[in-house]
Amino acid sequence: MKLKLSLCLVSAAMLMISCSRPGIVANSTVTIQSPLKSVSIASYSDTSSFSTVSDPRFLQICFDTVLVVQQTVHTEDDWHFKAFSTVTSDSLGSFFLNGRGPGEKSSPHMEKTHSGDNCLGIVENGTGSLSVVDIKASLQSDFNPVHLETCTLPSGVISSASLGDSSDFLVRLEGETLHYDAVSKDGRTTMTFNPFRKVNAQKSITQLSSILMSNEKCAIVAEVMLFLPQINFYDVASGKIKTTAVDKAAFDWRPVMENMIGPETVQYYQYAAYSPDYIFAVYCKSTLAGRMSGNAQTAIHVFNWEGDFLYDFKVNESLSDITYDARSKILYAINRADSRIIRYELSEYL
């Protein structure tokens, strides 16, 4: 088995070297990779699991045993977030009513984290207000949210990821430039990147849309791009950038940046999740019109934090958001067809 794996890795390395060329990221080459393994996997679910969720939008595992679901809200009496046990599927409580009063949120979104993290960052869109909620402590108080920290993100910040207790990774638009900065809690910039200097970021800000995820253990931030088939890895310690792509369309980035987003624009990645060992990304390679029709098939791509493309999981469903439980090795996903939360058992592979 070890010999076969070694041969496979060597073959993959040879392929990567032959397919490396400059791309959109400055001072970095794009490496086209094929997966080490392509596998079809089946989902499982039951009708009673998470039945109280109304139109789930986003998912996040916290504290290893809690699934937090952000649902669509319609009235001021609706909760934005509901929490469930991943062991029993029982409801654990709800938090943040829809509204603008004390303890309420009007347009929140969850920051990505890994399943072992006790805390969940929730950003209020429009104001940049960041609330860090201690999920473990909130459980012990009947889900009256326990805030560890409430702050406002700096002006111009459009995306962020935590690098632990000491620093954050901030993406900030300043004029025509996107700055990617590691910033300590006392406000010092400890590392900065300017990856998209070939592009007028102000004009192409939508085309540069991405999902940020961070691994404080290895001080790497992964950026899953939506309109290019690639993931950028920012090494905060060394200042180096590595880019892994899954399709040669990554080389043809100029038309993507220059053309307006429209129904025929191709979107490659849609949603993502991570653990300290793996990155999971929902891959569709479909026009926006095809995706909105619900006919676009999706796959789940799995990478390690070194940027190696490990698995291409073929699924029967068209998926939206995902989250991964590293303890049980179960991937949770939202099935776009019926808005139900489904699961994939991955312990055989990871």
What is each stretch, according to the model?
Residues 90-125, 149, 199-203, 316-320:
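Blade-loop segments of beta-propeller domains
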Residues 81-86, 181-185, 295-308:
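Beta-propeller blade signature
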Residues 261-302:
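Loop/turn-rich, solvent-exposed surfaces of beta-rich toroidal or solenoidal domains
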Residues 45-80, 278-287:
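Beta-strand-rich domains and repeat architectures in extracellular enzymes and scaffolds
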Residues 15-18:
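C-terminal motif of bacterial Sec signal peptides marking the signal peptidase cleavage site
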